[in-house]
A protein has these predicted regions:
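Hydrophobic, well-ordered secondary-structure elements that form the walls
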Residues: 299, 371, 383, 422, ...
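Active-site diphosphate/adenylate-binding microenvironment
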Residues: 7-11, 15, 19-20, 33-38, ...
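Catalytic phosphate/nucleotide-handling subdomain of diverse soluble enzymes
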Residues: 415, 419-457, 463
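Phosphate/pyrophosphate-binding active-site segments
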Residues: 137, 200, 296-387, 511, ...
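N-terminal alpha/beta PP-like core and its mobile active-site loop of ThDP/TPP-dependent enzymes
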Residues: 1-334, 374-377, 457-460, 477-480, ...
Length: 568
């Protein structure tokens, strides 16, 4: 047993937990920690981001891509508050993260000291748990608990706030082996009776649908899900967060459900007699009007978090547990079903309602389809938020889990660039591509400097239409084309901006330029920037208006038909 100071104890605890990378930004309250990290550069890589929000998003992207806990570090006051959006983003999407912040000395707490903020109080609603450490003897135990809480059950962010004196004070430290975080409760939280009821519901169904949420990704249940689909002979849809839990190239895959889901997925949920929901929380962006959601169906909901059961949608049977663990047992009770008539109906809808875009011009969907073709679907895609995010969900096919990193719950513009850096550092042998709109890029474009500084070989694609595209689309459809504050500056040369950081940069203005530029970007050894100039009137289709039912899903063709009838 050795006597170490708090900074040494923190670093030793991080090593215990297998931490190999930290994303952060130094400052006065964490100087002792940074001094100790300096001594361990060969064991723990520190990535200096351009802004603390970028550090939080990078830790998030690292966690989503690798499945490990992401770690970010910031100083007190504004350093800590700059993490808040990233922490909230991780909380909404159930991402395991430990955010470590420094604070003023214990004797200065509560005195409005320089750069003092009650960051524990600020983040209480957006963390699974948070701690303030004012005694060095409690530091090691707290760090270990933080990592366990972040990764256990339904994952999420944990904040550890450490006063500056704790980082200098000494106490005895004893190394401990890492205790693996429990994915579910130690004792099985579901019963044989529940499994029997679920098996009976599945056996009786004539028109079943399987709906996958983010929990299906977190639980690593893709093999069990494939087995369930085979046994049930059922079509599959997913939420934005569930993409990759089931092979997007499988003919039984209908696409995404919800506000910008496919007509096939939305209509099938309305028509089905059984909806099997795996690790989803029934977001309003998925369900539309909850009173009419899956109105003809019995609903079986499997989720690890009991708080999500019957919260937004009332279900007929719920099973509390990790999706993978539950399906392992449930699949044993099922016999192979056949639903030929139902599957033929699904195939007919897929043929009738394909996803479409304007094929005669350069569009976001076209570029993303080409990106999919040239990467053979093997890239990790991160996105910002808006039209390009929906196009990425619709037109890139995800056949593996943890290949789409996107802000689903909070809808954070500026998330994707930092997340792509974190993912690329976590998985250096994968190709990571961030898709952004010009509005989102302007939120955190400073992280391009981070990619340049560390030569992180991400590809940053910016779809430039000089407007806030998704907001403008709503103004077009629902606000009488009154375009209030959605026009962006048209005199910014983003290519020159990237080149000023010694980043290889391209501008694409025509369809016939796309293939060559993507190929060059994929061959590059460092970061690449691609600006794709698209029309401001390009929209995302299909669409369900806010508060409407999934039955009211409409396409561009439906809008034009309605306008034509109105003119007669």
């Amino acid at each position: 047993m050795a006597e170490l100071n708090g900074s040494q104890i923190l670093v030793e605890c991080l090593k215990e937990q297998g931490v190999d990378t930290i994303f952060g930004y130094p400052g006065g309250a964490v100087l002792n920690l940074y001094d100790e990290l300096y001594r361990h550069q060969d064991e723990i890589k520190h990535i200096l981001t351009s802004h603390e929000q970028g550090a939080a998003h990078a830790a998030d992207g690292y966690a989503r891509a690798t499945g490990k806990v992401g770690v970010c570090l910031a100083t007190s006051g504004p350093g800590a508050t700059n993490l808040v959006t990233g922490i909230a983003n991780a909380y909404m999407d159930s991402v395991p993260m430990v955010a470590i912040t420094g604070n003023v000395g214990t004797n200065l707490l509560g005195k409005d000291s320089f750069q003092e903020v009650d960051i524990a109080g600020v983040t209480m609603p957006i963390t699974k748990h948070n701690f303030i450490v004012k005694d060095v003897k409690k530091l090691a135990k707290t760090i270990r608990r933080a990592f366990k809480i972040a990764a256990s059950g339904r994952p999420g962010p944990v904040l550890v706030d450490i006063t500056k004196d704790v980082t200098a004070n000494k106490c005895e430290y004893k190394k401990e082996d890492v205790k693996k975080a429990d994915k579910a409760k130690k004792e099985k939280s579901f019963t044989e009776k529940e499994l029997d009821k679920a098996a009976e519901m599945i056996a009786k169904a004539k028109r079943p649908v399987i709906f996958l949420g983010g929990g299906a990704i977190i639980s690593e249940a893709h093999k069990e899900i494939k087995a369930l689909v085979d046994l049930m002979d059922a079509p599959v849809c997913d939420s934005l967060m569930g993409k990759g839990a089931f092979d997007g190239t499988d003919k039984r895959y209908m696409g995404m459900i919800g506000m910008h889901g496919t007509k096939t997925a939305n209509f099938s949920v309305t028509e089905c007699d059984l909806l099997v929901v795996l690790g989803a929380r029934f977001s309003d962006r998925v369900t539309g009007n909850t009173k009419s959601f899956a109105k003809r169906a019995k609903i079986l909901h499997i989720d690890i978090d009991p708080a999500e059961i019957n919260k937004n949608v009332k279900v007929d049977l719920s099973i509390e547990g990790d999706v993978k663990d539950v399906l392992k047992e449930l699949n044993k009770k099922l016999t192979k079903q056949s639903h030929d008539e139902w599957m033929e109906h699904i195939a007919e809808m897929q043929a009738k309602y394909p996803l479409r875009y304007h094929e005669n011009e350069l569009t976001g969907p076209y570029f993303i389809e080409e990106l999919y073709r040239l990467t053979k679907g093997d890239a990790i895609i991160s996105t910002e938020v808006g039209q390009h995010q929906m196009w990425a969900a619709q037109f890139y096919k995800y056949s593996k889990p943890r290949t789409l990193l996107t802000s689903g719950g909070l809808g954070t513009m500026g998330y994707g660039l930092g997340a792509s850096i974190g993912a690329q550092i976590g998985l250096p042998n994968k190709q990571v591509i961030n898709l952004a709109g010009d509005g989102c890029f302007r939120m955190n474009m400073n992280e391009l400097a981070t990619a340049a500084h560390y030569n992180v070989p991400i590809i940053e694609v910016v779809f430039n239409n000089n407007v806030l595209g998704m907001v403008r689309q709503w103004q077009t459809l629902f606000y009488g084309k009154r375009y209030s504050q959605t026009l962006l500056s048209q005199d910014i040369d983003y290519v020159k901006l990237a080149e000023s950081m010694n980043i290889k940069a391209f501008r694409v203005t025509k369809k016939d330029e796309v293939d060559e530029v993507i190929k060059k970007a994929l061959k590059a050894k460092g970061p690449v920037f691609i600006e794709v100039v698209i029309d401001k009137n390009e929209s995302v289709w299909p669409m369900v208006p806010a508060g409407a039912t999934l039955e009211e899903t409409f396409s561009e063709e439906d809008v034009k038909e309605k306008e034509t009838k109105a003119k007669k």
